[in-house]
Regions:
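C-terminal motif of bacterial Sec signal peptides marking the signal peptidase cleavage site
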Residues: 18-21
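Bacterial signal peptide processing site
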Residues: 23-25
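N-terminal carbohydrate-binding accessory modules
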Residues: 42, 48-104
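Aromatic- and glycine-enriched glycan-recognition loops and surfaces
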Residues: 97-116, 143-169
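Aromatic-lined carbohydrate-binding/catalytic grooves of carbohydrate-active enzymes
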Residues: 116-154
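Aromatic- and acidic-residue-enriched segments that line the glycan-binding/catalytic groove
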Residues: 131-146, 181-207, 244-270
């Protein structure tokens, strides 16, 4: 056997030994399969995904404090009746009634208004430059006692009485004034107590016997304003109404113009 052949035999032997070793290593390894049991969770055990709530935080400027006024509840309807005192139309029915009789008549009228669901009365307190209340500006009314400037006896204040009795019944009491009528033709004789005598410079006598304050005269305007302010400041009234707040009807003065050229021009030129 020559040398070359020996080398070949040796090389082949080495290859066989190597292959045998690799095969032996592979066969020594075992693959183990593990059985994994899977279970389906019960519906009650299934957890719902947690909901994530994102709060939106709004940033804004602080609101300014709003000034609020608490007002009394207002009646839905104004159901009022007028109570006229001029010429004793509604109250008092006569000029010579006693204090007790006057009060009884007032209560009867107010009870009637309450029974018929009225919620306000408009009471005439100044029919003709006079007063059916205690006034420091004008005399007691002729229509109350039959004598201008004479107070009721036994004494009481009619306006105060009407306010109290109306409010007891849940009825508002509004005062009614005639701002320019200074003396009514049915108001008896003009006496020293009358505004006609106390303030003649701003009062005009009409041809039908009435006397009228001159609306353009500042003295008239100031006087009427003081009368209203006096009532509002001293009585718990619910409103103020004006009637005959204009120049007299043409028929009152026989169709003649009201003599106010001087005061009217002065008023316009203010």
């Amino acid at each position: 056997m020559n040398l070359k052949f020996k080398y070949i035999i040796t090389f082949l032997s080495f290859v066989l030994i190597t292959l045998s070793s690799c095969s032996s290593n592979k066969s020594s390894k075992k693959i183990v399969y593990k059985k994994v049991e899977t279970t389906t969770p019960k519906p009650s055990e299934t957890k719902k995904p947690t909901e994530t709530v994102i709060a939106k935080i709004e940033t804004s400027k602080p609101k300014e404090e709003v000034f609020k006024v608490t007002l009394p509840e207002v009646n839905r309807e104004f159901r009022a009746a007028w109570v006229a005192t001029v010429a004793n139309i509604n109250w008092p029915s006569k000029r010579d009634l006693t204090t007790v009789q006057q009060k009884e008549e007032a209560i009867k009228l107010l009870d009637m208004l309450e029974a018929n669901n009225f919620n306000a009365v408009i009471f005439q307190v100044r029919p003709a430059g006079d007063a059916l209340y205690k006034s420091n500006f004008e005399p007691w009314s002729y229509f109350l006692t039959g004598t201008e400037g004479k107070a009721p006896s036994p004494y009481y204040d009619p306006l105060e009485f009407w306010v109290d009795e109306a409010h007891k019944r849940g009825i508002e009491l509004h005062v009614w004034l005639n701002p320019y009528r200074a003396h009514h033709s049915s108001g008896g004789p003009v006496t020293s107590e009358s505004m006609v005598k106390k303030s003649p410079e701003n009062i005009v006598r009409l041809k039908n016997g009435m006397y009228w304050f001159d609306p353009a005269d500042k003295k008239t305007q100031d006087h009427v304003s003081e009368v209203v302010k006096d009532i509002v400041s001293r009585y718990d009234i619910d409103g103020v109404h004006f009637d005959d707040y204009f120049y007299p009807y043409a028929s009152y003065n026989g169709g003649a113009d009201f003599p106010d050229n001087t005061t009217w021009n002065a008023y316009k030129n203010k």
